[in-house]
Amino acid sequence: MDIRVKLAGLELKNPVVVASGDIGCHVGQIKEAEHFGAAAFITKGCIPLSGASGLSRRTRIRVDFKKNALRGLAGFRRLGLEQAESLISDAKKEVKIPVGANVFVMLPTEEEKEIVTAAAKRLCRKGADFIELDTTGNLPVHFGETEKIGKTGEYFSGDMAERYPRFVYETIKAVKKAVDIPVFGKVAYENINVPALISAMEGAGIDVIDVGNAGMGVMPGIMDIHKPDRMAGDFVSADKILSLCLTGDALRRFSQAYIIRSAKSVSTPILGCGGIMGWRHIVEAIMCGAAATAVCSAFAIRGFGIIRKMKEGLIRFMEEKGYDSLDEFRGLFVDRVALTPGEIRVFDVVAKVDHEKCSGCGLCAKPAHCGVSERAIKILDNKAVVDEAQCLGCETCAGICPETAITMVRKR
């Protein structure tokens, strides 16, 4: 059973990469991840600007352990360039797995491009096996990472927004020219224009596209209309939660669609990240088109020890299905998902009711969109009756029926 991955020249013993996050701020974390079987490690994001306000932040994370999710975020650390250099240098003395350095790519200026390129060169010299350019787009402004820009939490707008994809393209070209190691590009789902960004990345010769980062939103269940004062996520050490809080299972709904979208749009290998909480999600990400996966929240909640269970579950699944390698099921979902309605071929069908099963509950007659010019389903003599001329063939009623009395059949 072969679960190895070749990713931009890196030899990974399995598809589990530790994503950039607060789980990657010191050497002990990297050593522990390697011990439990991580294939590679990406360090916490580095802000290469001296005195950036984001560097003084502190980690604040509330966890819902039963739901296997983060309940709230109120802050996270950043590394300065010197800290990132030290971490990479120390890690390469202690571990054998590939270790990459995450570097933020912020404001679309020539000065920023030069700063990022210089930082990448320095981290490469310290032994980084790859560089990950964290192209968060408008997010650094939202985070208020710099002193002059972003204190109000406003997004990029106007000319700055228009320049960002081109800026990313030029920065990647500059970094690729400056270093002789693979360069990854990380995308945020809250970015200005994800399709334009990944296209710019591929055009610039990026080696791997990391799709992606935490999403804008609040975790389900955190709003209590009866106790609005608890909106802070039960934090003792913070008075608010961050709106960039979509992680775990909730984030995976977005990440899988973006992985598929990226797989349809570019040929560059994709590192699938976002809501990978167990082996099943690794399989799903690979079936969505990912070459490998990056995991963060699951480790923040349950520790690196779950890597062993992830690998065991993956191998067991492959044995049960008869897969010898990851390539055999990579991308299986890609052609089953369309990006636009125009890509989908629909068939003329109508709803058929099995009156022996029908209880006459009337649920099938309630959907507001039912019918061409009037409702296609009526309840007559305590049974659902379909007017085939009015039936849209939408299949909603078949899914609603608690008795499974409705099936869809092709029109002759």
Region locations from a protein language model:
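N-terminal capping/small domains of soluble enzymes
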Residues: M1-V99, F104-E111
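Catalytic cores of alpha/beta
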Residues: G28-E32, E114-R125, N191-A204, K264-S265, ...
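Glycine-rich phosphate-binding active-site loops on the catalytic face of alpha/beta enzymes
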Residues: T43-L49, E132-G137, V208-M219, G275-I276, ...
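C-terminal helical cap(s) of enzyme catalytic domains, especially alpha/beta-barrels
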Residues: S53-K66, V218-G248, I286-M287, A298-Y323
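Alpha-helix-loop-beta-strand connector modules within alpha/beta enzyme cores
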Residues: D64-I97, Y155-G185, F235-P269, M310-Y323
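Active-site beta->alpha loop and helix N-cap motifs at the rims of alpha/beta catalytic domains
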Residues: K66-P165
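Iron-sulfur cluster-binding cysteine motifs and their immediate structural context
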Residues: L363-N382, T396-K411
